[in-house]
């Protein structure tokens, strides 16, 4: 068969196969055009998940009749001239409108501010009609009907109406985060109306609209710069995490992207604070010279290529970690909200037909606990593993004469210990409940990691070495990492076939189950990624040791020990979550407590 030139319609349909994969792809291209035209209000209407109808209305600059005629031609654009190294707009290829027109029924109505009347044009399955006069408001209305009617095979690959409508909503959410000064509305017969009023320069307010107010309450601001690149945005505290990565948003020069480099950098930044299988919530915006990033590497423009990827990755990881460190001991507020929802006041209401006897102190079987007296059952001496945090310098929080807590202590003053596992502390604004094991585990981990940067962790020799019987493979794996264990204060050596002798353990862990620790380390080494760097391996081992050497559940603590733990939490970055990403404390505001009792 001889080589021949394809028809313009077929060329556009081929391009549509790459650019317009589904209704959400068309919505993205049309919204980008509206934003490039300077719109401050964009309305999206859909039916049938965008397959039956997709209409995008904006109040942008509009087009003249001459520009409108060119707009539906392939590779006609006003956004670039003769180079791809200085792209400052969302669109630039001039492919979207002709591609959509080749597979759907496309109509465009537009008017510029200086024109007396508007202009309209239609393209049906690649066949273009002439430009005609039409009444119109300033701006542009692009209406797409019967998407893919000209290529019915594509319809077989469409998802359900609900799924396609949800994909369009997600496109609008990403655009809304990137452009807080623009009002977005999505409506239609296939959905509930979604509206994002403009928030001006308040980017966090727009993020609260899109991600919910929980994100606003649990976000830490990011603003960092390295060489030619600047990173801004917000990152959620580690305990505010999700079961998927759908709430990780990245933007490069205002363009929404789903770039693997950026997403992997986010994961790396949270690697030590979020458990496996959970994902952080973050909104990051990177601004840099357009010449330093190539946005023309993907048909949908969802991926980019940085000239210096190492710079971008380092900037993201460093900025997020610095922000989390600045966040200090913050834990997610959603824990307290979940606890509030678990209460069901109606279950405690008195039955109306049953007379209630008047309450008196004499007839009540309960007695209020006096917090000015030592609680019965507290240990007389601190646990060895806790002595580092129960020093005289870390004295209990003092209270003012009226009983209020000194504002210098955000986590308040310890008032009681519940079930020998939870510390209850009174704060200025309510109360805090601390998981003593999770909190101390994090403190020990941070102490070990800090010690590693300057010197090996101090060790304590066992009077009698502990012999641990293991499989030969486990012994080999443990001895292969003996040097790393030694830096962490754990000294092991071979003790004949199938046995390991533990001679020293980390001093800061006090008395501990050395045999249990060695067995757990052997199990974890069997599943370890050997490609991990030394720093990553040491952190992982330190986390395991910290778990074994922390204050255990069921251990009674004295008031000074509890207060010392609270003070150390306040002074330790990242103490709001344990090494597994779970919260170490939950805070209840006084207003929350009053709501539980029906107080206004």
From Swiss-Prot:
GO terms for molecular function: ATP binding; ATP hydrolysis activity; ATP-dependent DNA damage sensor activity; mismatched DNA binding. Signal peptide: none annotated. The keyword ATP-binding does not apply. Pfam families: DNA_mis_repair, HATPase_c_3, MutL_C. Keywords: DNA damage, DNA repair. One of its GO terms (cellular component) is mismatch repair complex. InterPro entries: DNA_mismatch_repair_CS (IPR014762), DNA_mismatch_repair_MutL (IPR020667), DNA_mismatch_S5_2-like (IPR013507), HATPase_C_sf (IPR036890), MutL/Mlh/PMS (IPR002099), MutL/Mlh/Pms-like (IPR038973), MutL_C (IPR014790), MutL_C_dimsub (IPR042120). One of its GO terms (biological process) is mismatch repair. Coiled coil: none annotated. This protein is involved in the repair of mismatches in DNA. It is required for dam-dependent methyl-directed DNA mismatch repair. May act as a 'molecular matchmaker', a protein that promotes the formation of a stable complex between two or more DNA-binding proteins in an ATP-dependent manner without itself being part of a final effector complex. Belongs to the DNA mismatch repair MutL/HexB family. This is DNA mismatch repair protein MutL. It comes from Sinorhizobium fredii (strain NBRC 101917 / NGR234). The lineage of its organism: Bacteria, Pseudomonadati, Pseudomonadota, Alphaproteobacteria, Hyphomicrobiales.
């Amino acid at each position: 068969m001889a080589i021949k030139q394809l028809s313009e319609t077929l060329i556009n349909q081929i391009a549509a196969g790459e650019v317009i994969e589904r209704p959400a792809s068309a919505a993205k291209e049309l919204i980008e055009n509206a934003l490039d035209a300077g719109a401050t209000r964009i309305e999206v209407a859909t039916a049938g998940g965008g397959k039956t109808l997709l209409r995008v209305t904006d109040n942008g600059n509009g087009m003249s009749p001459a520009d409108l005629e060119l707009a539906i031609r392939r590779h006609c654009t006003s956004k670039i001239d003769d180079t791809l190294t200085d792209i400052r707009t969302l669109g630039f290829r001039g492919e979207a409108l002709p591609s959509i027109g080749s597979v759907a029924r496309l109509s465009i109505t537009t008017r510029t501010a200086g024109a007396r009347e508007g202009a309209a044009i239609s393209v049906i399955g690649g066949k273009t009609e002439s430009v005609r006069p039409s009444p119109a408001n300033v701006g542009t209305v692009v209406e797409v009907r019967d998407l893919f009617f000209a290529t019915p095979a594509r319809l077989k690959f469409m998802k359900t109406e609900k799924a396609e409508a949800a994909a369009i909503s997600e496109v609008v959410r990403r655009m809304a985060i990137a452009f807080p000064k623009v009002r977005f509305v999505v409506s239609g017969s296939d959905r509930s109306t979604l509206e994002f009023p403009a928030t001006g320069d308040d980017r966090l307010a727009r993020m609260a609209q899109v991600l919910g107010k929980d994100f606003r309450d649990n976000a830490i601001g990011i603003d960092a710069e390295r060489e030619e690149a600047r990173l801004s945005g917000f990152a959620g505290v580690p305990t505010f995490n999700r079961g998927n990565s759908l709430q990780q948003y990245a933007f490069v020069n205002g363009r929404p992207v789903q770039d693997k480099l950026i997403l992997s950098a986010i994961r790396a930044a949270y690697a030590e604070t979020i458990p496996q299988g959970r994902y952080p919530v973050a909104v990051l915006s990177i601004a840099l010279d357009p010449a330093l990033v190539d946005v023309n590497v993907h048909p949908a423009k969802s991926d980019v290529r940085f000239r210096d990827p190492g710079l971008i990755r380092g900037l993201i990881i460093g900025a997020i970690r610095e922000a989390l460190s600045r966040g200090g001991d913050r834990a997610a507020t959603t824990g307290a909200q979940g606890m509030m929802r678990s209460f069901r006041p109606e279950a405690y209401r008195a039955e109306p037909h049953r007379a209630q006897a008047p309450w008196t102190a004499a007839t009540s079987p309960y007695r209020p606990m006096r917090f000015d007296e030592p609680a019965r059952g507290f240990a007389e001496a601190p646990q060895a593993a806790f002595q580092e945090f129960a020093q005289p310098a870390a004295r209990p929080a003092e209270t003012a004469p009226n009983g209020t807590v000194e504002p210098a202590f955000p986590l308040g003053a310890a008032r009681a210990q519940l079930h020998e596992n939870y510390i209850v502390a009174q704060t200025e604004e309510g109360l805090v409940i601390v998981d003593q094991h999770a909190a101390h585990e994090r403190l020990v981990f941070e102490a070990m990691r800090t010690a590693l940067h300057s010197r090996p962790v101090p060790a304590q020799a066992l009077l009698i070495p502990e012999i641990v019987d293991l499989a030969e493979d486990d012994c080999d794996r443990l001895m292969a990492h003996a040097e790393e264990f030694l830096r962490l204060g754990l000294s092991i050596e071979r003790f004949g076939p199938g046995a390991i002798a533990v001679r020293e353990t980390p001093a800061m862990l006090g008395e501990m189950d050395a045999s249990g620790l060695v067995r757990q380390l052997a199990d974890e080494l069997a599943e370890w990624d050997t490609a991990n760097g030394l720093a990553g391996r040491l952190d992982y081992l330190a986390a395991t040791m910290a778990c074994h050497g922390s204050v255990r559940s069921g251990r009674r603590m004295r008031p000074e020990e509890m207060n010392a733990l609270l003070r150390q939490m306040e002074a330790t970055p990242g103490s709001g979550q344990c090494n597994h990403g779970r919260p170490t404390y939950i805070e209840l505001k006084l207003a929350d407590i009053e709501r539980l009792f029906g107080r206004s």
